[in-house]
């Protein structure tokens, strides 16, 4: 018989650096999950990912206090900041431009993120990434 699900916890955890401190500790502690067990398993599973990369994580907590988790690809903004070398996006979105990104670069990001995006094809995925780039204050240029 399948385990009964108690709930889901969505967190953004940096690869290879899960610790019992906030926000992980309190979020898991409220559900009675073994915090150190999660941290060790997460760090082991993400050791091949560049340390410090933010990974959206969905933790499924079961009634017997056991858990499973899924890590997704890093956010589009992480890839965009990596490509442009920016620390953050524009403070006044739409009014100021902080950098440029090419359509080819957008397509590369879309390929990496395809499995996590709600898009049927690469063109639709690239448009989603383009929207994120514009929201960050990046100018899209043809290349």
Curated annotation (Swiss-Prot):
Q: Which NCBIfam families match?
A: L11_bact (TIGR01632)
Query: What family does this belong to?
Result: Belongs to the universal ribosomal protein uL11 family.
Molecular function as annotated in GO? large ribosomal subunit rRNA binding; structural constituent of ribosome
Keywords of the record, alphabetical order, are: Methylation, Ribonucleoprotein, Ribosomal protein, RNA-binding, rRNA-binding
**How would you summarize the oligomeric state and partners of this protein?**
Part of the ribosomal stalk of the 50S ribosomal subunit. Interacts with L10 and the large rRNA to form the base of the stalk. L10 forms an elongated spine to which L12 dimers bind in a sequential fashion forming a multimeric L10(L12)X complex.
Any one cellular component term from GO for this entry? cytosolic large ribosomal subunit
What's its job? Forms part of the ribosomal stalk which helps the ribosome interact with GTP-bound translation factors.
Record CDD domains: Ribosomal_L11 (cd00349)
InterPro entries on file:
Ribosomal_uL11, Ribosomal_uL11_bac-typ, Ribosomal_uL11_C, Ribosomal_uL11_C_sf, Ribosomal_uL11_N, Ribosomal_uL11_N_sf
BP GO terms, sorted: translation
**Name of the protein in its database record:** Large ribosomal subunit protein uL11
Could you describe the post-translational modifications of this protein?
Answer: One or more lysine residues are methylated.
């Amino acid at each position: 018989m399948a385990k009964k699900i108690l709930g889901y916890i969505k967190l953004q955890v940096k690869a290879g650096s899960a610790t019992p401190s906030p926000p992980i500790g309190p979020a898991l502690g409220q559900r009675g999950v073994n915090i150190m067990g999660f941290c060790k398993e997460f760090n082991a599973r993400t050791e091949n990912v560049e340390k410090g990369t933010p990974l959206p994580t969905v933790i499924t907590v079961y009634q017997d206090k056991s858990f499973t988790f899924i890590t997704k690809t890093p956010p589009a903004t992480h890839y965009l900041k990596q490509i442009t070398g920016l620390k953050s996006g524009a403070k006044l979105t739409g009014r100021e431009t902080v950098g440029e990104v090419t359509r080819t670069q957008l397509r590369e990001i879309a390929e990496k993120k395809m499995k996590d995006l709600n898009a049927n094809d690469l063109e639709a995925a690239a448009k989603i990434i383009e929207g994120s780039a514009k929201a960050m204050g990046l100018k899209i240029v043809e290349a």
